[in-house]
């Protein structure tokens, strides 16, 4: 049930925030299609957007460039709007190998994927909220531009149950089977139902902690109640309930029958073309594969790889855009593109890569030409579908600036009064020794340093050099997985080491108030890693510390360096002026380490309502030294499974803690063995 958006925050807008909120709201009310919010690091961009949403009361989609930032935004929005529907929509694949064919080696690679059940449930919850409520905020990744089930067909397939309605038990079971729910009287889990006499228990696909009990008397629905599927305890009785399909790709029977006829027609036309071109192998392969899929669809209502026939199933013409999450967003919805300088180019690049792979499959008879229409949106289609949009970035790209007509909403002044870092340019010749002395100064006063290099080799050599000179240093690179990366950042903040060396990982989304110095080596080498936007983003990592400073090592000033330094000085000047006028003394951020690492941990926290206390993890210190190796090995296996579960649920901090415990347990195991 919809409620008005209610913003929950102990803070009131300050600094540049009130003016930014006013200008954005005025622009939206005046019908501006595109606006850009240029918000520096630490200026509270998310809080500004939350205020705009609360004031205008409009359903909103927030696009983030990756899962980690999406999880961070989800966590923040959840805190701002605890009473409203804040949802999370990202790719549900933990692992995905798309179908592909390599002609040079005559190798066909079957589609292989591992689906994260919890994220699948959250995706279903997101679309349900968008169809049912007005007070909805969906935080999504670029997964939002990929094909999804048609919302019209999805709505047609819903099963409405109300107390007092006349319906036969077998009719309910038949409808549940059409929604792809499976009967399972033993293991009651998401997307299943069980039958006990005249009682049907249904575990909705979009829920993780509430199930529905339907009690029938003869052919009448006598009672509907929600209960905890774990304990069986009744939570509440309700007058009505709507059951949504188990997946977004459910299609009514009549639509499937019609689609099958259209597929047969396309197959006949394609066979003719292949035979005319003397492609006998391709013709045989295509006929065999397509007929097998048609038989599966006829018998079961779906087949493996059914998304390749999505054009027929959604009733769209050749070349028309596929249905996506944007089709679920109400007409007056609002789109917020976070870190737009990264997200917008991502959207533009998705279509071409997907098409190149599928054209090969079509050419060699693995798929019908209609498979090309199972694709992400083209950039022009995204532009046509996008509602009123706010682009949010510290370094907006040319596209956003052009679309906004150069009229950018500035949010440069931070509520804390913190200034942008002081920038110095120093010569390359002595960069390593100069850096070493700067590191020692910072380490002496318990502050941290980030160093960014151009190549992996240089990062490794620099790390080794600093270690030889007694510095506590770690190296962050692309081979490190997400959990370990978060652990490294946490350890830096906790003071386990003083210097973090990286290449291109020290940019968007890393908030480390303890970092007072950012050193950029070879800053005068113009290119992607030393562009104006890259430099501003990297310099911004020191903007959360009162003593923030950035040193650019370069023998000459490139155009990118000049622009980055000029922009930083413009911001610093404006911030200083505001502080003087309002008597503000800059204050450092005392953000708890856990706050930054809890990236959307609300996503998968098991609700303990009525379930008793959760079983504590065994601390290695409490493990008896005489514990048998076999028992230790069993405990290690248990914790490994738990660690992977936390990692899949984006609970990075818990995963890192278990990892530390595993390390100690393994040492005990070796000693015991």
Swiss-Prot record:
GO terms for biological process: nucleotide-excision repair; SOS response. Its main location: cytoplasm. GO terms for molecular function: ATP binding; ATP hydrolysis activity; DNA binding; excinuclease ABC activity; helicase activity. It is found in: Cytoplasm. It comes from the Bacteria. SUPFAM superfamilies: C-terminal UvrC-binding domain of UvrB (SSF46600), P-loop containing nucleoside triphosphate hydrolases (SSF52540). Residues 633-668 form the UVR domain. Forms a heterotetramer with UvrA during the search for lesions. Interacts with UvrC in an incision complex. Belongs to the UvrB family. This is UvrABC system protein B. It comes from Shigella flexneri serotype 5b (strain 8401).
